[in-house]
Amino acid sequence: MPNTTIIKLTAPALTGLTAATAQTESALNGLPTATVAATTSAPLTLDTALATRLTATINNTDYDGLIAEAHQLPATGNADRYQFVLRPWLWWLTLSSNNRVFQNLSAQEIVEKVFKDAGFIDYQFKVKSKPGKREYCLQYNESDFNFVSRLLEQEGIFWFFTHKEGKHTLVLADDNSAFPPITGEKKVKYQAAQSGERETGAVRSAELRLQATSQGFQSSDYNYEQPKAALFAQAGEKKGGMHSPHPGGFSEKAQGDALAAWKVNALKAQAKQLVGESDCAALAAGHWFTLTDHDDKALNIDWLVIAVSHEYDGERYRNRFTAIPKATPYRPQSSTPKPFMHTQTALVVGKSGEEVWTDKLGRVKVQFPWDREGKSDETSSCWLRVATAWSGNGFGAQFIPRIGQEVVVSFIDGDPDKPLITGCVYNGANALPYALPANQTQSGIKTKSEKGFNELRFDDKKDAELLAMQAQKDFQLAVLNDSKTTISHDEIHSVKNDRTRTVEEGNETVTLKKGNRTVNIEKGSDTLEVKDKRSVSVKGDQEYSVGGDETHKVKGDYTLNVDGNLTIKVSGTLTLESGKTLNVKSGAALNASATSDLKLNGTNIASEAKASLTQKAATITHEAKATLTSKASATQTVDGGGMLTIKGGMVKIN
């Protein structure tokens, strides 16, 4: 059969095109491109040609694309010449970039959203695995195409295009079963280049290439919500070289094991390749064919085309291809870099009406200034951890950034999907707590409450150094052992309500080494209750002044010892009352004196003196209602001095 090539151009927006030359390049997970030179018998209007479809059909094999470039070349003879660069619709994503946040979506859902937002629908997902939800995924300063590419690579999803006249479809998959055979006859003969006529649609040269690759993959990661979990995954063999990146990009062990398994396939996919030339126009990236009639029978197997370039020079057509055994599980390499994030700032956001919006881990949400889609509420970001000066199991420092504060956001390993708040900064809306530069010597911590603030403030101004503390409401201090306070000058306590001091067990000592002590109760009472013994020792004078009544009540004995004199002076009546016996004893003389009457009244009254008893008055009367006895054991003398009168109903003298 003669070696003839038929090429046809179909473009709804451009008529009368005749192909002159054509070159195309395509690869798995690569953007295909085609350059077509054409002639027309009449001039074309190129202004509306961009982004319109053009299909190049080479020997019944279609290559469809959108015109990305249109060039008007110098005319030759009666023909106008043009050149068109064709690209797939996916290439248009390289023309747009974005900064946005995706939350709680799988990689497939994110990619579909990007496609939808760009207005493209010609794609098919043939994914067997189920990509997990991503709590937080950031697109930052990268084209939509690069963003989509790296997400697909992270999930081990490869992609290629299928073509027909007027349409090309993006196929996204993660298993070799998604690769279709080439169009037409899937068996392609090996027919080495030779003179004379030859059959078209055959492989003209084929070269087997083997290369060393890593035979194993291992990686680790860290999940702060399960900090003790051993997140380590490994697959393949160490002896052939082990690829060991960190972090691995997984948060669960099962996820890591699955990732390691397909990462090994991605490493091994390039180990064995068939590189050749053919004039089979049906060869296309992502399609497989069966090689036949090769002298090396081991090569007569199914081959998957991973890259191919077609070339038509106006007379002759040929292509160059690279293929791997179809039986080799194919996964893409991770070649699209993640943006490396540097430190940024953001505003803390949360639910409307709240002052603080946080969770059990003290995380907050933020709105980045570049995020045009965020609503500055609790949906603007994922929960971001907040770095503190100290953290531990139930201890450490805790300061939760409030809604409206500007925070400094870093990214662990520069990963846009791993933000971490490392601090807070002031701005034009959030002023410092101590106005500057007037208070440049002041520093401290000042919080904010609905009605005021709590504060710990330091002032290092010379000769005015100060440490000030304020509790907006209650203040609690707990000391589990000793507490010692040393004050080198004055101390002032002012309590506007109650004050209670309790010493549960032990002693209390108050020592005033020099000076006076005054307790002034301006209004109210003073109560002292001692349930055991109380001692008061005053080495100098003590004076009591009571403006009203004073009452002492003693349930036991009452003893008053005075080394000097005791004077009791009462403006009114002095009453001494004993429920039993009243004893008055004097070591020397006992004097009882009254300016009026002095009365002794009792059932029996005895006056006894060891030496003599003298009763002296102007008149002394001894009167008994029954019997009055005057008796002396030895001698009794009754002397009237002047007159002695003894009177009775009967008087006996014996």
Cite the ranges covered by each PLM segment.
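Short, well-ordered loop/turn sites that connect or cap secondary structure elements
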Residues: D47-L50, L283, S376, P401
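Short, solvent-exposed secondary-structure boundary/capping segments
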Residues: Q72-L86, L170, E311-A323, V356-K360, ...
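Structural signature for extended repeat/solenoid scaffolds and their inter-repeat hinge/linker regions
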Residues: F161, L172, F289, T343-K616, ...
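Extended, domain-scale alpha-helical bundle/helix-rich regions
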Residues: T24, T52, A75-T76, L105-E109, ...
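Short, basic/aromatic beta-hairpin or loop at an interaction surface
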Residues: Q23-V36, K253-Q270, E373-T388
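Glycine-rich, acidic and aromatic/proline-enriched surface loops and short helix-turn segments
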Residues: R87-W89, N104-F125, P247-A258, K351-T379, ...
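Assembly/oligomerization scaffold segments
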Residues: M1-R100, Q154, A271
